[in-house]
Amino acid sequence: MASSDTEGKRVVVIGGGLVGALNACFLAKRNFQVDVYEAREDIRVANFMRGRSINLALSYRGRQALKAVGLEDQIVSKGVPMKARMIHSLSGKKSAIPYGNKSQYILSISREKLNKDLLTAVESYPNAKVHFGHKLSKCCPEEGILTMLGPNKVPRDITCDLIVGCDGAYSTVRAHLMKKPRFDYSQQYIPHGYMELTIPPKNGEYAMEPNCLHIWPRNAFMMIALPNMDKSFTCTLFMSFEEFEKLPTHSDVLDFFQKNFPDAIPLMGEQALMRDFFLLPAQPMISVKCSPFHLKSRCVLMGDAAHAIVPFFGQGMNAGFEDCLVFDELMDKFNNDLSVCLPEFSRFRIPDDHAISDLSMYNYIEMRAHVNSRWFLFQRLLDKFLHALMPSTFIPLYTMVAFTRIRYHEAVLRWHWQKKVINRGLFVLGSLVAIGSAYILVHHLSPRPLELLRSAWTGTSGHWNRSADISPRVPWSH
């Protein structure tokens, strides 16, 4: 993987989060001199901080990226397998919907622990270094010049061959690219926010089924719970900010949970629920799209800096990790030629990252509203049956996204085609059933339906036979 033509070339990665740290591993493995600049302090020694910590769902794409740098086994060993969605109805009834076949599962991963492991992996390379407490002040991407502010607040200019922007949804690197002509950008805050709650262990064990992603769908809002290695569950309540504002007091919160999530209260505990609910305000969720992802051969965006997505398909981290893997594959293909790799990365990756962004928006509606419907369950069973019957022709959308590396936009196209075929098949089947039912109904109501039809036809035929002077003419009768 490493190549002599990368030795001595310097890459600066802005952002030491998940994607930035993994990217640094890929680049260091290629013999680049890698410097990672992270605005926060080192989370491995920092005091516990709450905030942006929605549990992560690691699936096939992310695992393949980790595998490429030799980290898959280490990370997977610290995750909890989730084989199904466990749907909690308002009555307290629970029903499991498997994600795929018996061998397929996604992993619940702690964001904090994963980030710590990735930072440690970066520092294991002698040609890579992580600089904490350094904030990007100014960026000239065409020249590869950055101005950083360190802990002493003294500006320092840095020159490099490549700038990799992995600094999240509010990317400073992207803000500098937005000043360039022909750079498209859009962002959307969804009207819903999220709040993190906790279900502690019960008698030293999981309080619910551990190998499931638990969902309380309530149409306009929902709550989910992902298992942790310490036998607790991290719960996330997704709801519109207007609804959150209607819960200013402890009694309002308790009434709301008794009405909508009555089975969750004894699992959380009333006191713990109140403590967690008022610890932090609801956090916003943003979706970001931009194009292109690069500027010449000097700068490229990856992860949330390029395509922040809402978390409802569990693909934010996986898409970001796949960015790193795709870029690495392009570097192999084009011999580390940045002037070719960067534009090709934009061309190849933009349709996929925009597709998963749209799918994530769609999946929020499915998770909070559709999973309770009988039609949804019927579609899932039909998808499963057709996939078992024709595994290479019919592949469920979730399977394509979570358990393969089929490109995101191709998965969407294939999903639409499959839906069209299935809907036409159901229409034909429904028509045949309707015709058959009509025939049976007529046959049941009339004791001699066929004789009546036959006599009616005979009488009509006799009339035409007697009328010899009248003969129908058709084009082929000459």
From Swiss-Prot:
EC number: 1.14.13.9
Reactions this protein catalyses: L-kynurenine + NADPH + O2 + H(+) = 3-hydroxy-L-kynurenine + NADP(+) + H2O
Keyword field: FAD, Flavoprotein, Membrane, Mitochondrion, Mitochondrion outer membrane, Monooxygenase, NADP, Oxidoreductase, Pyridine nucleotide biosynthesis, Transmembrane, Transmembrane helix
Domain text: Transmembrane domains are required for enzymatic activity.
Name this polypeptide is given: Kynurenine 3-monooxygenase
Tissues of expression: Highest activity in liver and kidney. Low activity in spleen, stomach, intestinal tract, esophagus, heart and lung.
Keyword Transmembrane assigned: yes
Record's bilayer topology term: Multi-pass membrane protein
Protein origin, superkingdom: Eukaryota
GO biological process per UniProt: 'de novo' NAD biosynthetic process from L-tryptophan; anthranilate metabolic process; cellular response to interleukin-1; cellular response to lipopolysaccharide; kynurenic acid biosynthetic process; kynurenine metabolic process; L-kynurenine metabolic process; L-tryptophan catabolic process
Similarity comment: Belongs to the aromatic-ring hydroxylase family. KMO subfamily.
EC category: oxidoreductase
Cellular component terms (Gene Ontology): extracellular space; mitochondrial outer membrane
Chain's role: Catalyzes the hydroxylation of L-kynurenine (L-Kyn) to form 3-hydroxy-L-kynurenine (L-3OHKyn). Required for synthesis of quinolinic acid, a neurotoxic NMDA receptor antagonist and potential endogenous inhibitor of NMDA receptor signaling in axonal targeting, synaptogenesis and apoptosis during brain development. Quinolinic acid may also affect NMDA receptor signaling in pancreatic beta cells, osteoblasts, myocardial cells, and the gastrointestinal tract.
